[in-house]
Regions:
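N-terminal leader segment of winged-helix/HTH proteins
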Residues: 1-35, 81
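Short hinge/loop at the helix->beta-strand junction immediately C-terminal to the helix-turn-helix recognition helix
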Residues: 52, 80-81
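Short, hydrophobic-biased segments on the C-terminal half of alpha helices
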Residues: 73-74
Length: 112
């Protein structure tokens, strides 16, 4: 049976019914997949230590190919985990700490 975009699932938690939209669920899965990867976790840790960095800074520090670093940064950007800021010809990457806090709260709630 093919699910429609507007279809929802009802979850029960503590006597409460929670409506969960499948499209929202798919988006959440993409975000969780983005941060559940060893290399991307290393990038997140590096950005946390350094505030903002260029892709060149990142691939040199982590000893990666430039294309690999760019690909993983793009995944993190699409997930809303990193922000970009252009300064001249350089693009600086930084963490969206508010977004990471949201993800952390969600994971804690799901795990608990």
């Amino acid at each position: 049976m093919k699910k429609q975009k507007n279809e929802t699932v009802t979850l029960k938690k503590g006597g409460q019914d929670i409506q969960l939209d499948y499209s929202d669920l798919r988006k959440a899965v993409l975000v969780l997949r983005a941060v559940n990867h060893k290399l991307r976790q290393r990038i997140i840790d590096l950005l946390e230590e350094n505030d903002s960095m260029t892709v060149t800074d990142i691939y040199i520090k982590l000893r990666l190919e430039q294309s690999v670093a760019s690909q993983h940064l793009a995944i993190l950007r699409r997930a809303g985990v990193v922000l970009t800021e252009r300064q001249g010809k350089f693009i600086y990457y930084s963490l969206d700490k508010e977004r990471l806090a949201q993800i952390s709260r969600l994971v804690e709630e799901l795990a608990g």
